[in-house]
Amino acid sequence: FTGIGKVAGDSPVILLNGFSKVHLMTGWRIGYIAFNNSPKLGPIRENLPKLARVRISTNLPVQHAALESLRGPQGYVSEFVSELKKRRDFVVNRLNSISGLSCSVPKGAFYAFPKIENNPYKTDQEFVMELLRKTGVLTVHGSGFGAKYGSGHFRIVFLPDIKTLDFALNEIEKFCQ
């Protein structure tokens, strides 16, 4: 793997990232921005701190926690990714085995986005509301992520343990029958 910053030369490179996924800090609302040394980024590099001071920033304890997550051991990252792949594969395989659903393998998130084939409800939003009402399984309607690509889908998180995912998927399967 070669980072874009190494091959960019003097072309501008701006990296935006957060701590939610890799550092398990979902909901802490902290991220960072990094620049390469391109002279074209001078005005941005100079003025961004001014903008950051105007906006409400993440509280100080969270900033220190984020710093420690970078300084501390990183071995958990590969273990976490490996476990997430197992959960992802479990969820995708189960979803694809349920009549009326089809799901591609996600490659960069901890969500699956199955397509609802022959939806008996008028919309994907109605589908997820009925799923919640009848089973207690909470998902998010796909059209909430944009009508063009999201309609007819729903989003399910595969962060919970396999036992919890299995329970939820059993409920989804019963709901789809």
Regions found by a protein language model. Name each.
Residues 130-139, 145-177:
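PLP-dependent enzyme catalytic core of the Aspartate aminotransferase-like
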Residues 13, 101, 137:
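Short, conserved active-site loop motifs that form the nucleotide-linked donor/cofactor pocket
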Residues 118-121, 161-163:
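Helix N-cap motif at beta-to-alpha junctions
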Residues 6-85, 94, 176:
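Conserved core segment of the aminotransferase class I/II
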